[in-house]
């Protein structure tokens, strides 16, 4: 089952996500929380976990992903945009996943510095990550 929590900023997405993850884990489900919010660093705290490393960095960071997106745009859609190969949870490097008590967390990417620029590569990666998982 895949479940996506979305909404306006400040409406409680992180709180609902953490509560849902805890409840599903308490029922014996294996839970993977995918943090796709590039500007909010709070979800790992709601889950009581350490902050994970950005998944995006394992793929060349924002610069590497941005170049893939630009190549796709220059092809005017003739090339297929594929950031990730097909994968399973076991294929995700262990250093990019944090977790305990039946809950695992992966963070797609975060804006770490003021004025860092566009988060478009993170959005594209998040979309494909969730589709292929």
Regions found by a protein language model. Give the residues of each.
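N-terminal phosphate/diphosphate-binding loop that engages ATP/GTP or pyrophosphate donors
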Residues: 25-101
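Phosphate-binding/switch loop-helix module in NTP-utilizing enzymes
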Residues: 78-133
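Walker A (P-loop) phosphate-binding loop of P-loop NTPases
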Residues: 10
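Hydrophobic positions on the alpha1 helix immediately C-terminal to the Walker A/P-loop
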Residues: 16, 20
């Amino acid at each position: 089952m895949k479940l996506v929590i979305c909404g306006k900023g400040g409406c409680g997405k992180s709180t609902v996500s953490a509560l849902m993850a805890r409840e599903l884990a308490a029922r014996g489900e294996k839970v993977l929380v995918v943090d796709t919010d590039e500007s909010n660093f709070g979800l790992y705290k709601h889950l009581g976990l350490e902050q994970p490393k950005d998944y995006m960095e394992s793929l060349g960071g924002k610069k590497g992903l941005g170049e893939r997106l630009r190549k796709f745009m220059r092809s005017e859609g003739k090339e297929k945009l594929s950031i990730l190969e097909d994968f399973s949870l076991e294929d995700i490097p262990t250093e990019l996943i944090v977790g305990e008590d039946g809950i695992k967390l992966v963070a797609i990417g975060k804006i770490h510095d003021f004025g860092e620029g566009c988060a478009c590569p993170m959005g594209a990666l998040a979309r494909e990550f969730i589709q292929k998982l």
